[in-house]
Amino acid sequence: MSTTRRDPPVRRRRFAPPMPPTPPPSRPVRVAPPGTTLALRLSIALAVVDAIAGLVSVFVPDVFRDDPAYAGNARGTYTVILLVALPAMVLAMWASVRGWLRANLVWLACIGYLLYNAILSSFSLRFNALFPLYVASLSLAVASLVALLRCIDAGMLARRLSPRVPVHAVAAYLMVIAVGFALLWLADIVPALLAGTVPASLRGTTLTTNAVEVIDLAFTLPLTLAAGLWLWRGRAMGVLLAGTMLVFLTLEAISVATDQYFGHLADPSQPTSAVAFFVVLAAVGALPTVAFLRGIIEPLHGPTARRA
């Protein structure tokens, strides 16, 4: 009886699919907030307008038709705009496009500072050749502010704030500044109302009202107080507003110290007591400002970003 010899079955080797090559490590790229293109374009236009106005103000002082002290104040303000505010805003715009959250706060604050001074220039300075630029700056600053605010996620900012940030101390600082300057301005206004005269800040000037007091009491100080209260209560909008107002107040303190010094240079009869006060205020305000900005934990994202 013959048997057929069968070879043992060949066991097929099962191969694992080849592993894809490991990509080289790459540095994560931060993502810009969606919709920043419009804010960028408006802010670039704002920077160009203010740069032109600043250069003319600093190097062609005869453009002003105001008394020497007030013209000196304006030159001091535009010196700060040229040397501090505009470089800070351009740097913040560059960083924001690359996704740095804290840069948005600096950008907002710089726009707010330029808006503040556009209002002062438009309504306080005597009509001069730069008036169209003052109006253009006012319009562009408002548009830039609105466009940028639409791009910022206050909730993300709040979630990214480090628990190490002394929020109650920062909030208290903001509320003290708001209440303190409100009392200072009211001390100038209320006695004049009761006596039926003009405030002391207007005596010896050609101004009909004090535009600084108007802007501060109507906008700056209420926003500063709201920032402090909301931050104290842990609201997301408080983080956005507090960070913005901290940078703004520091910029404004530097600006006032500088414009008062330039006013004294133009008219030595003008006191310099405010210079030292605002230098100290700027130095003190820089401490919570830096601590707050450093306390924002920057997120890392994928390699692409969409900008509308």
PLM-predicted stretches and their roles:
Residues L42-A53, A136-D153, R164-P191, V212-T220:
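Alpha-helical transmembrane segments of multi-pass integral membrane proteins
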Residues A39-L40, V97-C110, M237-M245:
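Membrane-interfacial loop-to-transmembrane alpha-helix junctions, especially the N-terminal start
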Residues L91-A147, A154-V165:
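Membrane-interface helix-loop-helix junctions at boundaries between adjacent transmembrane segments
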Residues Y70-T79, L202-L223:
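A loop-to-helix transmembrane entry motif
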Residues V80-L91, S137-R150, F219-A226, V280-G295:
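Hydrophobic cores of alpha-helical transmembrane segments in multi-pass inner/ER membrane proteins
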Residues S2-G35:
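Short, Lys/Arg-rich, polar N-terminal cytosolic tail immediately upstream
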Residues P191-L207:
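Membrane-interface interhelical connector segments
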Residues E213-A308:
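C-terminal transmembrane-bundle signature of multipass membrane proteins
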